[in-house]
Amino acid sequence: MISDDSDRFNPRDPKPANAGKPSKSAKRREARQLATQALYQWHMAKHSLNEIEAQFRVDNDFTDIDGAYFREILHGVPANKNEIDTALVPCLDLAIDELDPVELAVLRLSTWELLKRVDVPYRVVINEGIELAKVFGSTDGHKFVNGVLDKLAPRLREAEVKAFKR
């Protein structure tokens, strides 16, 4: 039996039904990018989360962005800041307040995902963190983020990491 899969290639219509539409993972990647910028702004300017969210929604087209995920990250990271920072500290060679603010935003977002979004595989969290650091961080910031997340993931997702490495 052939299922009715709307994403399936139709030889009479060479353009798939989802052509031009970003995937769920692409929409989440965009949400993470905006959330990184918003978390940086929150950390540096100390504006309220609602003000930052409103401004980002005015300044950006959310058509191709997972807006709910952006909001969840933007409000979830500050709400869990103490838990996130406590998890990060053992994996750092510097104090939290000595970290580059962009790399701190990326690390907090990634740590939040490791702690609160167990539906997102740890390898995806690490990869997305590295990519965010490449886009927004310093020249070698992605290497630093990778090193920290590689230490952190087994602490927060021990069973998942062990299962993957078998």
From Swiss-Prot:
It comes from the Bacteria. Pfam families: NusB. GO terms for molecular function: RNA binding. Keywords: RNA-binding, Transcription, Transcription antitermination, Transcription regulation. PANTHER family: ANTITERMINATION NUSB DOMAIN-CONTAINING PROTEIN, N UTILIZATION SUBSTANCE PROTEIN B-RELATED. GO terms for cellular component: cytosol. The lineage of its organism: Bacteria, Pseudomonadati, Pseudomonadota, Gammaproteobacteria, Pseudomonadales. One of its GO terms (biological process) is DNA-templated transcription termination. NCBIfam families: nusB. This is Transcription antitermination protein NusB.
